[in-house]
């Protein structure tokens, strides 16, 4: 153990040593520690002493000889440099010191300053030789007599002179002014160039001088000081100007032995290199080692002789010593390498490409040129390229090939690239070949040579090219883009010797605009232009590029490739494409398929899912069409036209201001559907020997394809369906043509006449001669505008002109229906065409008898009127006769007659015979009828006259119940009948009572099923029968037919209709409902089931009819369902419907006053809320207008009435609310305050108002508020309380200063403007007198006095013990602190009267204006002190005031929430300690569409939430007293989050934008980069140094700003607890967030104890925090108490996007320095609570129950025995942490059992168990036995527990005295024997879950200010267990 401890101690020493050393390196610094300055002169000399890594305060010793001027940075709070200047004339050498004190660390740096006179000066330079046209900077430096250099000469004046050295007039140097030179002083950080330039501009020179070489030669430069009496001090130098020389090839030059080459000499003239013609008279050449190389002295021709190194020198003879040299290295070669580089067709090397050596594979592109270079390198390791000369033997083979050609370089380029070692390769065609290069050289002796050889393989490839389907062959791709839609497109590429897709590499120039995959699939990212480059993996120079432009779609058009109309029941195809702003179509846009919404303007055209129809896509691709972006298939359900619309709408922000904020593209197309073209017979043949058709039936139900006509007759036909005329721009066709015809001319046998006068689609077809033909009717639209494809429909009609082959009679039918004709023609007949079977008809009536012609094919004729008919009656004398009068009235045709039947029964024969041609047609058609046709053209029928028997109803659905009965009624026939059922197990016939045998029959159900009841009338011959179908069934369903949501006004009743039936949809008659045991089930007592006769209470009563009534009792929403009992015993349930009970609607406010131009959002209080809409109207729109949202605009003075009408889902009016509005111009204004008096040091808000209204009526229209106070010694305005820029200047806050009265005045102007209707401006002035009440002369108790309201019981304010809970008296459970009220014993009445009393830990008050003090006595130590005093006062004022709302202005983000605390004050402005529930308050706003306000359960807070951008004024008032009001202006919009943060140096902070309507893009800026740096794009900031600055965000039309404060170091650290945080089963002490302090001046007080701190939670709606200290360990915490699920459900503003977990932060800040803060983030996972009992008792009468959950509804629920219980979810409002769910529990078995339902939340592991007991009412003997055993166990357990407690108490009694004594006598700091002190509070009653911060502040202040109070460790506690 000892070695381990020693190692640990040694490690700590090392760490501390390292820390100390790091501190020595870091810290503040200055540039100089010793400075030499001249004395005060005519021109002062300044020196800047620069500091770094600190913020300095400057001081110096001798203020008489030195001046120090600090310089501040941009923040004006920190000095990092100072200017030093001597201010005393010279009187000998002087010394002083300057001190730089770092205000952050306190470190002091000393700088010694010497002041002395000049002894000499000297010109300093970098070189005495400068180039021709070159610059040189000369500087003067001064020295004292000890040769110490002066630190600065800036500011002194000098005289500079230039003079030729030879004394001539030609100068070789010229002066360059400083302002024209390229010199800089780094913005003043590295020089004083600005001062030196000013000196030159004034005509003198500074210590800095710049010259330029103008001519070759020598020049004298002199300088002397222009400062009396030191003008004799001077200096002089000589500078040489020479011409700059350079040699090519560049040095060093490596050559082979025997090589010969010449140098090129270049000189700089005018900063341009120029070659010198050799030989030159001014230049001579030489070599240092002539054994290695030799050189020509005139022209510089050099030859390498032997291996070695030497130098060639060229000298300019005009300037002595001006030479230039080049190193020559004669070497042997080591390697020969070939290089290939791309070569442009223009003859230039492509410089950006890197040459490829022969060590790599060479790939070249067919059709391109390449430069091949042969290079030689010397030996390794330092290989150098050898300069190839004309004498070197180097060769290249393989010039001729099928794949390439090699040519020499042009002469003009041979000097640059080398004629000997460079060639140009022209690639011709793809293929593979080789090149060979050799070098022959001397190996070291002139006699022997060696050869280097290299062979290189070359592959020629095709050029890499994109394959684009571009019309203009421009390599450009256009792709669309919108946010979250990334269009993709595959690019096709060829060439590059590629064999697979992996042989290409893809690149994009801007990945933020366009991305590309490894397979060539590009994806659009944002708008812009990017270049996609594809490169062959074998050759990086073989590539192709395509420009891809990504743009936002500008328009959308329909593709004109499909028909726009089609026949009903088929599909129309449609497709759209999009275009860019320039009209170009996109290359691909199918990614928008899902975003483009298709819709039609009619329900007859249905959009079906056609995205997977590949045939349509293939069809589009095969067409010459633009690429489709979206496709649709439209099913045509019915006829008509509509507009097909494709819409692409999306809201977003762009990346620059030139782009709009949304996209809304539409493309429309008119489409239509028509019925199939058909021919319908329009003329009726019913009276003319033809068939009948119903003109009234639907046109699509009746068409004709064949017509049979007798010559001489006609028929009218009508065209139905087909396309209608499209429009005037589309040609419409409607024709008739012959498909085929007989030999004769068509016009001679048929006539088709278009009846234009009657109807456009009517044709008359008349038959002229015998024969057959077919007609084709064509109708439709051809090509035209918006009609790209013709749509022509056709219909065929066959016409037969012939004679009937037979006739048939139709008896007792109103018309000649085709089915009746067909049945009659197919009936059996006897000779003479007499129908065998008689036709039975009822007697006593007139019946119609008609004849119809039948063709040889059995088809009925359409018209046979050309033929005449003869009618005959046989054996009908007493039975029937022709009613001629009726015939003449009803018909004029001979093909139908009317027969009158007598009331007799029997047989009667009717015959009709064709007798010839009608007389009107005989002349033309007399020869058509053949001889002997009468025998065949006849028909006869026998009539059986009887009475008809009928049974009603013919179908009956019967409920299966023994008590059910079915009555059947019979009519007609005789009274002799028999009834038979075909299934006796379903029903039986019961004979009716006497007297009803002939009219009724009764059935009784016997079993489930269907049966047919047949009734035979045996009284007629032949017997007649009638049928009835009976179905016996059990009820399958019951339904509430009145709707799923019902709204009822409170106090009224509502009738609900029911339906019952079976699965096939048939319903029972209401007479059977009484047998179904129908019950009404209501969730709660909001509504009650009442009887129909009276409104008596009858909940659960049976329903015996098809409707029942409910009465609305209380407000709210409940559910209701009904049940019916089946015969099997089971129950069927209806759907559950919602029933809402609403109060009568009221318009809020019901009466309002506004000024012209003001607005106010009205709302409806009460009224229904389910599926309703509200319509607002005003009677007089000239006075006020109102929008649909309820926003009322005052326009001009007057009065009007406002109606708010509430409509249901079907448009019916449900109810109405009425209000009134007055618009006027107030004549005067007044100033309003909540009280006329205010105490000294206290505050009170004041605001203007009008007699007719308040601030809500006019504040938006007024401005220029000017506040004044007559006597500011009495009253003052609080600084910065008026913020006119925030439009809150209408509210001001005054504070009392001294006793007295004074007048407060306000003046303001208002512009009452209603655009186009009213305009007037007025100025108002108002004032009031306020009194300031002074403090009492001696009011030491005022700070420790609690203000409470009268007749009030406080929360537990009085702690009962100073000991922790576990050390209290375990027997009595009483604390050791006793409280009592101090009373005046001299007055017995006052003594006995308890005006203020103590109840436990609470204080109770009675009347107002009472004051009492509370005495506290410690029973342990006997100490007595005054704990506090209580004053009782009336609540007189109200405020919305907190630290976050200091000046009545709030900035709130959209969607953001904020809690507004409600505080109460007395008449003097003194706040109440508590006033829970004493009075009511109202919170109102003029714009409820901007801000949502919610108050919860009379809590002293109002919660607001930003709804949309805008401003709203919030007013809080005591009751309806508007004088007792306070105002807060809320501005809702986008904000920077977090607002006004405080961070520490080195920390990071992410800024973001909250509350914006859409996604915001822009840039971030900081006003001071030295304090904080911020990322321009992301908004991430880093604190650099201490200070304050502003962070600004600039976006599209948006500029936001917030202040940032940076503190030095982290002073407060907050950590998160490691456990899972939830709001269920919260620890009693809450969740602990450890808070740690850094020991600096912010965190330590003068007494050494930790300073107090505050805790806050954000967002505040999830819980509350309070600070706490563990007195034993000294650890400090923020205790977090989350609100329960029940509290969150009732207090939170519910939104749909809430989650079951909430991220929050806990912030801790010092009370003395709130900027010093820290925070920690954590995640709260919501739990759940079960509302209701923890045990469910269910019985057979109610075998279902409901389980309700609140909170986190992501639970799992199950029971142990699934065969007994079923659990189903019936309702779930998933609002995250504040959700609500209901589960329905059904009993499946009718047997007694117990079970347990287990509800589990997987996220937290929370488990809740609910016991279930199902009692059938059977014998409880067995359970009683079990109950006795359980009771015995409980009694035994209680007995054991009592004994254990007694023993434990005895043990504690023996140990308490020792512990108590030790605790009472020990008064030092906490040691091992000190008990653990964790709590000093017993909470008797808690009105609010939040710790009252005023109470904490007050107790601290009371304890600190109490005289003679001993601040011992035991006594210094906070009653709320807080710091």
Swiss-Prot record:
Belongs to the NUP210 family. Residues 1-22 form the signal peptide. It is found in: Nucleus envelope; Nucleus membrane; Nucleus, Nuclear pore complex. Glycans are attached at residues 73, 117, 289, 609, 863, 903, 967, 982, 1171, 1199, 1550, 1568, 1743. Gene3D superfamilies: 2.60.40.1080. One of its GO terms (cellular component) is endoplasmic reticulum. The keyword Protein transport applies. SMART domains: BID_2. It is a single-pass membrane protein. The gene is GB210. It comes from Arabidopsis thaliana. Part of the nuclear pore complex (NPC). The NPC has an eight-fold symmetrical structure comprising a central transport channel and two rings, the cytoplasmic and nuclear rings, to which eight filaments are attached. The cytoplasmic filaments have loose ends, while the nuclear filaments are joined in a distal ring, forming a nuclear basket. NPCs are highly dynamic in configuration and composition, and can be devided in 3 subcomplexes, the NUP62 subcomplex, the NUP107-160 subcomplex and the NUP93 subcomplex, containing approximately 30 different nucleoporin proteins. The chain crosses the membrane at residues 1829-1849. Its main location: nucleus. InterPro entries: Big_2 (IPR003343), Ig_GP210_15th (IPR056232), Ig_GP210_16th (IPR056233), Invasin/intimin_cell_adhesion (IPR008964), NUP210-like (IPR045197), NUP210_Ig1 (IPR055096), NUP210_Ig2 (IPR055097), NUP210_Ig7 (IPR055099). This is Nuclear pore complex protein GP210. GO terms for biological process: mRNA transport; protein transport. Keywords: Glycoprotein, Membrane, mRNA transport, Nuclear pore complex, Nucleus, Protein transport, Signal, Translocation, Transmembrane, Transmembrane helix, Transport.
């Amino acid at each position: 153990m000892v070695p381990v401890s020693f190692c640990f101690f040694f490690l700590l020493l090392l760490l501390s040593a390292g820390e100390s050393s790091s501190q020595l390196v870091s810290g503040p610094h200055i540039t100089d520690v010793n400075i030499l300055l001249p004395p005060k002169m005519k021109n002062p000399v300044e020196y800047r002493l620069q500091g770094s890594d600190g913020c300095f305060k400057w001081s110096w010793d001798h203020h008489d000889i030195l001046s120090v001027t600090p310089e501040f940075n941009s923040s004006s709070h920190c000095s990092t440099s100072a200017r030093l200047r001597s201010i005393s004339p010279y009187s000998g050498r002087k010394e002083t010191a300057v001190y730089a004190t770092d205000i952050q660390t306190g470190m002091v740096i000393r700088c010694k300053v010497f002041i002395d006179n000049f002894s000499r000066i000297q010109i300093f330079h970098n070189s005495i030789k400068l180039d021709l046209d070159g610059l040189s900077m000369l500087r003067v430096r001064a020295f004292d007599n000890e040769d110490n250099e002066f630190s600065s000469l800036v500011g002194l004046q000098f005289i500079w002179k230039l003079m030729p050295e030879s004394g001539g007039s030609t100068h070789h140097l010229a002066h360059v002014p400083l302002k024209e030179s390229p010199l800089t002083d780094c913005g003043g950080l590295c020089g004083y160039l600005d001062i030196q330039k000013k000196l030159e501009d004034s005509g003198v020179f500074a210590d800095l001088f710049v010259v330029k070489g103008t001519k070759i030669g020598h020049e004298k430069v002199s300088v002397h000081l222009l400062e009396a009496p030191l003008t004799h001090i001077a200096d002089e130098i000589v500078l040489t100007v020479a011409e700059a020389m350079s040699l090519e090839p560049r040095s060093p030059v490596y050559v082979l032995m025997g090589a010969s080459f010449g140098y090129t000499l270049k000189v700089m003239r005018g900063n341009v290199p120029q070659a010198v013609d050799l030989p030159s008279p001014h230049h001579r050449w030489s070599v240092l080692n002539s054994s290695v190389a030799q050189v020509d002295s005139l022209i510089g021709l050099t030859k390498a002789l032997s291996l070695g190194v030497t130098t060639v020198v060229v000298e300019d003879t005009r300037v002595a010593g001006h030479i230039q040299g080049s190193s020559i290295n004669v070497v042997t070669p080591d390697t020969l390498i070939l290089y290939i580089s791309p070569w442009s067709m223009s003859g230039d090397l492509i410089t950006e490409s890197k040459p490829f050596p022969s060590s790599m594979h060479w790939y070249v592109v067919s059709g391109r040129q390449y430069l091949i270079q042969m290079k030689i390198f010397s030996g390794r390791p330092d290989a150098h390229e050898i300069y190839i000369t004309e004498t070197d033997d180097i060769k290249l083979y393989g010039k001729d090939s099928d794949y390439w050609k090699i040519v020499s370089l042009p002469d003009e380029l041979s000097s640059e690239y080398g004629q000997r070692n460079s060639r140009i390769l022209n690639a011709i065609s793809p293929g593979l070949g080789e090149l060979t290069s050799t070098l022959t050289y001397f190996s070291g002796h002139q006699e022997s040579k060696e050869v280097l050889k290299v062979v290189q393989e070359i592959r020629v490839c095709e050029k890499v090219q994109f394959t684009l389907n571009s019309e203009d062959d421009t390599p450009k791709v256009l792709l669309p883009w919108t946010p979250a839609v990334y269009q993709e497109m595959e690019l096709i590429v060829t060439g590059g010797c590629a064999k697979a897709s992996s042989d290409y590499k893809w690149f994009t120039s801007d990945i933020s605009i366009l991305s590309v995959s490894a397979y060539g699939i590009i994806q659009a990212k944002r708008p812009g232009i990017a270049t996609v480059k594809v490169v062959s993996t074998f050759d990086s120079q073989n590539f192709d590029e395509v420009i891809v432009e990504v743009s936002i779609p500008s328009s959308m058009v329909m593709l004109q490739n499909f028909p726009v109309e089609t026949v009903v029941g088929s599909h129309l195809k449609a497709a759209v494409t999009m275009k860019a702003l320039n009209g170009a179509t996109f290359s691909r846009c199918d990614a928008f398929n899902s975003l483009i919404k298709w819709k039609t303007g009619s329900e007859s055209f249905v959009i079906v899912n056609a995205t997977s129809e590949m045939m349509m896509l293939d069809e589009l691709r095969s067409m010459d069409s633009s690429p489709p972006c979206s496709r649709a298939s439209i099913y045509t359900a019915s006829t008509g036209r509509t507009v097909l619309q494709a819409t692409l709408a999306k809201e977003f922000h762009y990346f620059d201001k030139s782009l709009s904020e949304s996209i809304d593209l539409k493309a429309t197309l008119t489409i239509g559907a028509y019925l199939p073209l058909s021919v319908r017979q329009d003329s009726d043949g019913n009276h003319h020997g033809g068939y009948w058709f119903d003109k009234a039936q639907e046109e699509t139900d009746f068409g004709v394809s064949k017509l049979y006509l007798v010559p001489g007759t006609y028929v009218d036909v009508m065209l139905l369906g087909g396309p209608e005329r499209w429009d005037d721009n589309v040609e419409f066709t409607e024709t008739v043509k012959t498909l085929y015809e007989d030999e004769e001319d068509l016009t001679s046998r048929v006539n088709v006449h278009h009846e234009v006068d009657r109807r456009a689609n009517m044709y008359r077809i008349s038959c002229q001669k015998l024969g057959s033909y077919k007609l084709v009717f064509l109708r439709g639209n051809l090509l035209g505008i918006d009609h790209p494809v013709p749509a022509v429909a056709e219909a065929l009609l066959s016409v037969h002109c012939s004679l009937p082959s037979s006739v048939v009679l139709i008896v007792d039918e109103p018309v000649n229906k085709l089915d009746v004709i067909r049945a009659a023609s197919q009936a059996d007949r006897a000779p003479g065409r007499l129908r065998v079977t008689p036709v039975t008809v009822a007697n006593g009536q007139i019946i119609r008898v008609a004849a119809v012609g039948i063709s040889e094919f059995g088809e009925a004729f359409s018209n046979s009127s050309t033929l005449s008919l003869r009618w005959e009656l046989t054996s009908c004398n007493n039975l029937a006769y022709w009613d001629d009068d009726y015939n003449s009235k009803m018909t004029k045709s001979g093909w139908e007659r009317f027969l009158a039947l007598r009331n007799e029964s029997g047989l009667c024969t009717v015959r009709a015979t064709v007798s010839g041609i009608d007389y009107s047609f005989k002349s033309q058609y007399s020869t058509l009828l053949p001889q002997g046709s009468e025998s065949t053209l006849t028909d006869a029928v026998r009539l059986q006259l009887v009475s008809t028997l009928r049974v009603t109803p013919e179908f009956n659905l019967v409920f299966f119940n023994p008590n059910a009965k079915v009555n059947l009624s019979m009519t007609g026939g005789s009274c002799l009948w028999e009834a038979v059922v075909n299934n006796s197990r379903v029903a039986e016939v019961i004979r009716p009572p006497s007297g009803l045998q002939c009219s009724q029959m009764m059935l009784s159900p016997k079993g489930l099923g269907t049966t047919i009841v047949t009734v035979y009338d045996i009284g007629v011959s032949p017997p007649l029968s009638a049928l009835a179908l009976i179905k016996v069934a059990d009820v399958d369903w019951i339904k509430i037919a009145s709707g799923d949501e019902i709204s009822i006004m409170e106090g009224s009743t509502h009738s609900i209709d029911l339906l019952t039936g079976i699965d096939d949809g048939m319903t029972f008659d209401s007479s059977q409902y009484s047998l179904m045991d129908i019950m009404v089930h209501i969730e709660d007592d909001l509504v009650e089931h009442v009887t129909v006769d009276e409104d008596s209470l009858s909940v659960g009563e049976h329903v015996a009819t098809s409707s029942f009534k409910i009465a609305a009792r209380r407000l709210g929403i409940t559910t209701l369902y009904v049940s019916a009992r089946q015969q099997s015993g089971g129950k069927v349930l209806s759907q559950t419907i919602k029933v809402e009970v609403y109060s009568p609607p009221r318009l809020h406010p019901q009466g309002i006053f506004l000024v012209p131009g003001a607005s106010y959002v009205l709302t409806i209080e009460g009224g229904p809320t389910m599926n309703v809409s509200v319509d607002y109207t005003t009677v007089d729109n000239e006075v006020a207008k109102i929008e649909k949202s309820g926003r009322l605009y005052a326009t001009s003075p007057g009065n009007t009435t406002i109606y708010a009408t509430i409509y249901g889902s079907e448009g019916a009016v449900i109810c109405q609310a009425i209000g009134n509005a007055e618009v006027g111009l107030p004549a005067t204004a007044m100033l309003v305050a909540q009280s006329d008096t205010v105490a000294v040091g206290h505050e009170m808000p004041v605001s203007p108002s009008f007699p007719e209204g308040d601030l809500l009526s006019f504040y938006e229209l007024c401005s220029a508020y000017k506040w004044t106070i007559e006597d500011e010694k009495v009253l003052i305005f609080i600084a910065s309380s008026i913020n006119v820029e925030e439009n809150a200047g209408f509210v001001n806050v005054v504070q009392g200063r001294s006793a007295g009265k004074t007048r407060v005045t306000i003046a303001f102007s208002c512009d009452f403007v209603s655009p186009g209707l009213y305009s007037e401006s007025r100025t108002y002035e108002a004032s009031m007198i306020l009194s300031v009440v002074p403090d009492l002369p001696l009011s030491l108790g005022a700070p420790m006095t609690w203000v409470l309201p009268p007749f009030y019981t406080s929360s537990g304010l009085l702690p009962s013990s100073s000991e922790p809970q576990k050390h209290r008296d375990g027997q009595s459970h009483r604390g050791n602190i006793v409280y009592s009220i101090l009373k005046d014993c001299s007055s017995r009445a006052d003594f006995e009267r308890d005006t203020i009393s103590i109840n436990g830990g609470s204080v109770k008050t009675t009347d107002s204006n009472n004051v009492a003090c509370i005495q506290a006595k410690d029973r342990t130590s006997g100490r007595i002190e005054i704990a506090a005093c209580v004053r009782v006062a009336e609540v007189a004022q109200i405020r919305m005031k907190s630290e976050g709302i200091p000046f009545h202005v709030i900035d709130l983000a959209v969607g953001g929430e904020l809690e507004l605390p409600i505080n109460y004050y007395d008449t003097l402005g003194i706040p109440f300690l508590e006033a829970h529930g004493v009075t009511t308050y109202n919170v109102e706003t003029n714009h409820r569409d901007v801000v949502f306000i919610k108050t919860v359960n009379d809590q002293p807070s109002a919660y607001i939430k930003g709804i949309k951008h805008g401003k709203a004024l919030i007013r809080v008032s005591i009751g309806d007293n508007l004088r007792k009001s306070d105002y807060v202006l809320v501005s809702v919009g986008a904000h920077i989050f977090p607002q006004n943060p405080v961070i520490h140096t080195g920390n990071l902070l992410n800024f973001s934008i909250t509350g914006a309507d859409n996604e915001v893009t822009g840039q971030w800026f900081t006003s001071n980069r030295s304090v904080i740096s911020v990322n321009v794009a992301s908004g991430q900031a880093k604190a650099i140094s201490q200070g304050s600055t502003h962070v600004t965000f600039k976006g599209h039309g948006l500029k936001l700003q917030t202040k940032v404060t940076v503190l030095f170091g982290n002073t407060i650290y907050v950590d998160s607890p490691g456990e899972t945080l939830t709001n269920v089963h919260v620890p009693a002490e809450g969740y602990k967030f450890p808070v740690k302090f850094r020991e600096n001046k912010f965190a330590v007080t003068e007494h050494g104890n930790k300073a107090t701190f505050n805790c806050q939670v954000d967002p505040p709606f999830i819980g509350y925090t309070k600070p706490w200290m563990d007195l034993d360990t000294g650890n400090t915490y923020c205790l977090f108490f989350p609100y329960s699920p029940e509290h969150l459900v009732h207090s939170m503003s519910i939104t749909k996007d809430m989650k079951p977990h909430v991220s929050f932060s806990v912030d801790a800040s010092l009370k003395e320095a709130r900027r010093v803060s820290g925070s920690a983030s954590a995640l709260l996972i919501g739990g759940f609570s079960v509302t209701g009992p923890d045990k469910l008792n269910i019985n057979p009468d109610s075998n279902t129950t409901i389980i309700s959950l609140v909170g986190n509804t992501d639970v799992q629920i199950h029971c142990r025995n699934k065969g007994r219980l079923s659990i189903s979810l019936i309702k779930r409002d998933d609002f995250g942490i504040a959700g609500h769910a209901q589960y329905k529990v059904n009993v499946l078995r009718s047997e007694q059992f117990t079970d347990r339902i287990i509800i589990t939340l997987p996220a937290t592991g929370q488990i809740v168990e609910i016991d279930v007991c199902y009692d059938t009412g059977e014998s409880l003997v067995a359970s009683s036995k079990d109950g006795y055993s359980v009771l015995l166990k409980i009694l035994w357990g209680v007995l054991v527990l009592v004994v254990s407690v007694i023993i434990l108490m005895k043990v504690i009694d023996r140990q308490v005295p020792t512990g108590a004594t030790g605790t009472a006598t020990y008064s030092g700091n906490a040691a091992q024997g000190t008990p653990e002190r964790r709590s000093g509070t017993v909470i008797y009653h808690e009105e609010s879950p939040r710790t009252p911060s005023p109470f904490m502040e007050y107790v601290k202040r009371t304890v600190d200010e109490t005289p003679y109070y001993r601040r011992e460790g035991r006594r210094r506690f906070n009653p709320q267990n807080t710091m």
